[in-house]
C-alpha cells in the first residue's frame, strides 16, 4: 500500500530532501530505485567470534568466504570441471597473485589458461551478482580495470551472436594486452565482495594467537563490518588508553603465552626494560618467565589499588595480595589457609603495612609501559577502529549480538546492579557499560579507565561474567581454589523462556529472534551443541585459536545468514596459504541448518529495508509537495 503523504507545509526533512532531489524526475527515479531494491534477496551475512589472533586460519577463511566460494563453483560449473580443476580454480580465486606466480614459474600461465580462467571468473561473478542492483556493481569492482569488468558483466553471449563476438573479443584483447594477471586479481576481489555483504565479529581479536594486529588490518579493509567487543578487546583498548591494570595484564598474558611479538613487532612496544629488571630479581629463571613473574606482581599491586578506589565494581574479594603470610608461606583466604607454590617476593616488603605499594623501579617500568602503549600509532589506529565500528552489543535484522552475557540471577531474572547510587539491569546495564567504555576513550578519566579493567574480568561484567581467579591460579597449589564461578546466564542459555526474555528485553521477537554469542568455547567433540534453546541462542565460539582445538575438537565456526535462513559451519580443518598453493588444499567444514526460511527473505525484511521504507515515505511526501505546489521544483 502506498504511504499516505502529508499535504501541509513542508517540514525540515522535506526541505532537506528537496536540496538532494530538486526535480520531480529525480524524486521518481529514487523512488523507483528504492522500491525495486526492496524485493531483492537480502545480502549474505557472516558471523565469527573469538579469532584470538589466529591470523593464518582467519586469512584463509576470509579468502574462501568460509567455503561459500567453493559451493558457488560447484553450483556454476558442476560436471563441466573435474574435482581437481575446481580445487585449482578456487585456489586461484583465494590467492590470485600467488597462484599466478606459481603457474608462471611452472610455465603453465599460457594465453589459453588466462582466457579460460577469466571466462570462468566472469561466469561465477555474473551468477553471484544477481542479488545486487546493477547500479551498485561498479562500486564493488576495483577501480583500475572497472570499465572493462563492467562491460564484461553486462554482455549476454547466450542471447545474441553479436554479444558473443563482443565478449570473445574483450577476453582476447585482455590477453593480447598482457593484462590477464591484473584481470584475474580484480575478478577474484569482486567474487569475494559479492560472496559476503556484511561481516559481524562477535568479539575477541586478541589473546593467544600471534597476529591480532594483522587480523585487524584485514578487517579494516572490509566494506561492511561491525564489531561486538569481547573481554580481550576491551583489555587492549583499556591498555591503549593508558589503564595501568590493563597494561600490566596485557603484558603478563603476552609473556605467559610466549606471545610478545605482537607487542614488540606489531605495535612497537619494547619489553626490554621489564625483562632486564626481572632478570635481576629472578636470576635463576628464564628471561621470559622472570618477566612474567615481575609483571604478575605489578598487576596485583595496581589491581589492588584499582579495586580499593572503586567499591561499586564489586571486586573486593579479588584484592588478595595482603592475604599472603610470607613467613608461613601460605595465603589466608576466607575459605581457608592454602600453601603457596612459590615463596619468593623480592618486590614486596614483607613487613610493610601496604603490600600494594609500587617500588621505585616498578613505577619507572610502569610509567614507561604506559607511554609506550598510549603512543603506539598502530595500536591507536586499531583501537580507533574498534571504537568506530564496535559496541557492547548490536541488534540487527532480528538478531542480538554480544560477546558474553546479560547478568542474571539464579532463577533467570535480570540481575540488578548498583553503580554510583543508581540501579541497572538487563539492557540498561549493557548500555551503561557501553557508555563507560566510550567515556574512557573520549575523556581518559580515572574512573572510566578503571571500568575498562572491570569489563575485562569483573564478575558482573557482561563481557566476562565469571569470577576470574588469577591470584589463586598463580600462587596456590590447591586446584580446588581455581574454579571460576560463572554467571547463571551461561547455564540458562538452554532454557527457551530465559532466551525469550532476553530477546524481548532488547526489542526483538521472542519467538523469531536469535541471540548470537561467543566467549565460551563449544566442546563439539564431547557432543555439545552450539544451538541452544530450540534455536533461540547460537554460540559461535568454536576455537579458531590452535590452543583451543583440543578443547573444542574443531577449528572454529562461521554462522551464515542469507535469504534462505541460518546455516552454521563447523570448520574441521582450515588450510593456509602454503597448503592451498602446494596441493590446492581448502577448508573442510560440516554444515548444520539452524533455521530454514519458508519464503526467501528480501531486503525489505531487513533493518536496511525498513530504513528504505521510511525514505520512500518521505520521498512520496516530497513528490506530493511538488505536485501540489507546496514546494517548487527546479526547472
Sequence positions of predicted segments:
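Feature recognizes metal-dependent phosphohydrolase scaffolds
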Residues: 1-635
Amino acid at each position: 500500500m502506498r504511504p499516505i503523504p502529508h499535504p501541509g507545509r513542508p517540514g525540515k526533512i522535506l526541505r532537506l530532501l528537496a536540496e538532494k532531489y530538486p526535480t520531480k524526475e529525480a524524486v521518481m527515479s529514487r523512488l523507483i530505485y528504492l522500491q525495486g531494491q526492496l524485493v531483492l534477496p537480502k545480502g549474505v551475512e557472516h558471523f565469527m567470534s573469538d579469532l584470538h589472533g589466529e591470523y593464518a586460519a582467519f586469512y584463509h577463511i576470509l579468502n574462501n568466504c568460509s567455503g561459500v566460494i567453493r559451493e558457488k563453483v560447484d553450483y556454476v560449473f558442476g560436471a563441466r570441471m573435474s574435482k581437481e580443476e575446481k580445487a585449482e580454480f578456487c585456489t586461484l580465486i583465494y590467492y590470485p597473485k600467488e597462484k599466478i606466480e606459481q603457474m608462471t614459474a611452472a610455465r603453465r600461465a599460457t594465453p589459453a589458461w588466462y582466457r579460460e580462467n577469466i571466462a570462468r571468473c566472469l561466469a561465477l561473478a555474473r551468477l553471484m551478482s544477481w542479488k545486487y542492483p546493477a547500479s551498485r556493481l561498479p562500486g564493488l569492482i576495483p577501480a583500475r580495470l572497472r570499465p572493462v569488468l563492467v562491460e564484461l558483466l553486462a554482455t549476454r553471449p547466450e542471447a545474441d551472436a553479436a554479444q558473443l563476438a563482443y565478449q570473445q573479443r574483450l577476453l582476447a584483447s585482455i590477453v593480447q594486452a598482457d593484462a590477464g594477471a591484473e584481470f584475474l586479481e580484480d575478478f577474484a576481489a569482486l567474487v569475494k565482495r559479492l560472496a559476503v555483504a556484511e561481516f559481524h565479529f562477535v568479539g575477541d581479536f586478541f589473546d593467544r594467537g600471534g597476529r591480532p594486529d594483522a587480523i585487524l588490518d584485514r578487517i579494516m579493509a572490509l566494506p561492511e563490518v561491525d564489531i561486538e567487543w569481547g573481554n580481550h578487546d576491551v583489555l587492549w583498548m583499556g591498555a591503549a588508553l593508558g589503564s595501568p591494570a590493563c597494561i600490566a595484564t596485557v603484558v603478563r598474558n603476552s609473556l605467559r603465552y610466549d606471545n610478545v611479538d605482537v607487542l614488540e613487532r606489531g605495535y612497537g612496544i619494547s619489553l626490554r626494560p621489564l625483562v632486564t629488571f626481572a632478570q635481576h630479581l629472578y636470576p635463576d629463571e628464564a628471561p621470559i618467565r622472570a618477566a612474567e613473574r615481575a609483571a604478575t606482581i605489578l598487576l596485583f599491586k595496581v589491581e589492588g589499588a584499582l579495586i580499593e578506589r572503586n567499591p561499586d565494581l564489586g571486586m573486593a574479594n579479588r584484592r588478595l595480595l595482603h592475604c599472603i603470610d610470607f613467613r608461613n608461606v601460605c595465603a589466608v583466604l576466607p575459605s581457608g589457609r592454602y600453601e603457596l607454590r612459590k615463596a619468593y617476593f623480592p618486590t614486596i616488603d614483607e613487613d610493610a603495612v601496604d603490600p600494594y605499594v609500587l617500588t621505585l623501579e616498578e613505577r619507572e617500568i610502569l610509567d614507561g609501559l604506559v607511554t609506550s602503549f598510549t603512543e603506539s600509532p598502530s595500536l591507536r589506529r586499531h583501537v580507533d577502529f574498534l571504537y568506530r565500528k564496535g559496541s557492547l552489543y548490536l541488534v540487527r535484522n532480528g538478531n542480538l549480538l554480544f560477546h558474553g552475557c546479560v547478568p542474571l540471577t539464579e532463577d533467570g531474572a535480570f540481575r540488578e546492579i548498583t553503580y554510583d547510587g543508581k540501579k541497572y539491569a538487563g539492557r540498561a546495564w549493557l548500555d551503561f557499560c557501553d557508555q563507560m567504555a566510550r567515556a574512557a576513550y573520549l575523556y581518559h578519566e580515572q574512573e572510566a579507565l578503571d571500568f575498562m579493567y572491570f569489563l575485562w574480568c569483573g564478575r558482573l561484567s557482561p563481557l566476562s561474567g565469571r569470577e576470574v581467579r588469577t591470584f589463586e591460579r598463580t600462587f596456590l597449589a590447591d586446584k580446588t581454589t581455581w574454579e571460576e564461578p560463572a554467571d547463571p546466564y551461561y547455564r540458562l542459555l538452554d532454557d527457551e523462556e530465559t532466551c525469550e526474555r532476553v530477546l524481548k528485553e532488547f526489542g526483538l521477537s521472542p519467538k523469531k529472534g536469535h541471540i548470537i554469542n561467543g566467549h565460551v568455547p563449544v566442546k563439539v567433540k564431547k557432543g555439545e551443541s552450539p544451538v541452544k534453546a530450540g534455536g533461540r541462542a547460537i554460540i559461535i565460539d568454536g576455537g579458531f585459536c590452535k590452543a583451543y582445538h583440543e578443547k573444542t575438537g574443531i577449528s572454529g565456526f562461521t554462522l551464515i545468514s542469507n535469504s534462505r535462513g541460518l546455516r552454521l559451519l563447523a570448520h574441521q580443518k582450515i588450510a593456509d596459504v602454503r597448503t592451498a598453493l602446494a596441493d590446492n588444499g581448502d577448508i573442510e567444514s560440516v554444515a548444520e541448518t539452524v533455521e530454514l526460511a519458508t519464503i526467501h527473505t528480501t531486503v525489505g525484511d531487513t533493518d536496511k529495508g525498513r530504513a528504505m521504507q521510511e525514505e520512500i515515505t518521505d520521498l512520496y511526501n516530497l513528490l506530493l509537495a511538488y505536485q501540489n505546489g507546496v514546494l517548487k521544483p527546479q526547472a
